[in-house]
Amino acid sequence: MRSDIVPGAIFPDYELSDHTAKRRKLSELQGQHPMVLVLSRGGYCPKDRRQAEGLVELHRELEVAYCRLVTISTDNITETNEYRTGVGAHWPFLSDAGRIVQKDLDIAEYTDPAHNPMIPHVVVLEPGLVVYKIYNGYWFFGRPTIEELRQDLRAVLSKCRPDWDITTPELKAAWQQGRKEFFYPYGKTYAQTLGEQD
């Protein structure tokens, strides 16, 4: 991983094609929410498929917690779509068949020249693509467990959600004064947030 991609740094706002061939920017997929970004070898790898299967259950929690999940692999669009469908995923999968991310982040898995994938990583991002934590998943147990991701997201949410603890006198007073910008969805209507879902 590039030496400047560390906690507190801004992660690059890559624009890639998703599993439907639609161009997507990471910042647009993230919106105002924390995000778990999975950098994957691809659907051919049994470790990556197992990881994605485990994330299916977590994704249901992420949706109700207003968090995002995105997977990027070096698969082409057809393989990306098949990978996503095959593991039963419902979050965006992006195709980096051109190895843009792999090269830019310096994460080519040189031990597998036949597939030329990325070294698997999981990056937990605060809103604004701010890096919170990076996991190197070359070995399967280097990847975060579902519980570790829950803990990471708890820490991120407690930092970025002004209404994390609504028992404070300040928040109670703000609510009574009609100052809803301190409460989710922070000045937007719930209908507006529906357009941000994927």
Residue ranges and their predicted role:
Residues 1-198:
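Chalcogenol-based redox active-site neighborhoods
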